[in-house]
Amino acid sequence: MEEPSKVSAPTAVNGHPVVQSHAEMHQRCLNPYRSKVTVVLGAQWGDEGKGKVVDMLATEADIVCRCQGGNNAGHTVVVNGVDFDFHLLPSGIINERCKSIIGNGVVIHLPGLFEELAKNEAKGLTNWESRLIISNRAHLVFDLHQQVDGLQEAEKGGKSLGTTKKGIGPCYSSKATRNGIRVSDLLGDFKVFGEKFESLVNMYKRLFPNFEVDIAAELARYRDYADRLRPLVQDTVSFLHGSLREGKSVLVEGANAAMLDIDFGTYPYVTSSNCSIGGVLTGLGLPPQTIGEVIGVVKAYTTRVGDGPFPTELHDEVGSLLQTRGGEIGVTTKRVRRCGWLDLALLRYTAMVNGYTALCVTKLDILDTLKEIKVAVSYNLNGERINYFPGSITALGQVEVNYITVPGWLTSTEGVREFSELPPQAQDYIRLIENDLGVPVKWIGVGKGRESIINVKD
């Protein structure tokens, strides 16, 4: 009887070498990739200058990603004296050698996206068609979501949340209640897409009697958008994992900021997505072991757009000076930002949530003209010092802030490019932040342009 031929064990499966033991398999699970993801997150209430940091780091990146939010975010990046404004696009799109990904956690307003591309093309953005990749799982923001956003805010009257009225909240609500519409729906059977769209319209009509949408006109628009969008769309999860296995450098640009996170921010005065580290994982389909550096971007003072508690807010001439010198007007909303002192109690909290491995302190130069600078170090609630950040906005509105006062430097820092050349008082200010948070400051912003960054060496 002929013996059966022996079948040799495969040496590789799906491109992975076959391991010989559980220990080896476990080790591969702990570190299956040749590279790690660098994440840039806002550490306060947004507008910290994340786009500038991403633009700087994107020069060395192969891929830059957005993972959450929509066109309620706003980044300005200055390149060769030209201001590029980004709302949906990753600001790394300026870098012609890297891919830009809009991940599944982002909600996309297609009219806004194509308008943003056109505006930045007019300013010199080129060849984006070969570099922009959009997730097929991302949800779509329709004009009707923006209409609903305005109606909901109007219903709240004097208790409105101060949203950007970009339709972000209603779109994420549609996603959570499972009647949202994704990019893959638009690119699939258009008849089915039309039925889903009509169902969404009818749902809102039941909620708002005066709600009106020209369904035929909208579907005609979106048939055109489908053709324009199709070449840009793919499965970004597989693309990213493949890129990490190849050792590609991946950079993630968080939108909004930690204190606007729907779970950890000053709820309900927050955005509708997770803009802390968790949103990076769910918004791109990445496991925790892919994360390397987590860079927290900290403005040298604190700002906030819209309503909600703000313990260190200034209502005096110093607040006005910060608004004026800092050009504190929202990129997206054009609203004047509220300004206040740096809040270390708040930053300790966001550092716990996000696990920063490094910091970038921006707009240090805005403090150049102040003789004295106050820094919040803790809060008192009901007469007692607390060692936590209040989860209730009622409690947060009642805290008494404990400040320390440090000397200003009364000299311009705008031309400084080495940490050792900063005035001693400015160096002390940076060291105060580092020592309190236990996180190194690696970069300091002292002006608008990408060249106005101090690289802090050990």
Curated annotation (Swiss-Prot):
The lineage of its organism: Eukaryota, Metazoa, Ecdysozoa, Arthropoda, Hexapoda. Belongs to the adenylosuccinate synthetase family. GO terms for molecular function: adenylosuccinate synthase activity; GTP binding; magnesium ion binding. Substrate binds at V331, T332, T333, K334, R335, V336, R337. GTP binds at residues 46-52, 74-76, 337, 363-365, 445-447. It comes from Culex quinquefasciatus. SMART domains: Adenylsucc_synt. Binds 1 Mg(2+) ion per subunit. This is Adenylosuccinate synthetase. Pathway: Purine metabolism; AMP biosynthesis via de novo pathway; AMP from IMP: step 1/2. IMP binds at D47, E48, G49, K50, N72, A73, G74, H75, T164, R178, N256, T271, R335. Keywords: Cytoplasm, GTP-binding, Ligase, Magnesium, Metal-binding, Nucleotide-binding, Purine biosynthesis. Mg(2+) binds at D47, G74. Gene3D superfamilies: Adenylosuccinate Synthetase, subunit A, domain 1, Adenylosuccinate Synthetase, subunit A, domain 2, Adenylosuccinate Synthetase, subunit A, domain 3. Its cofactor is Mg(2+).
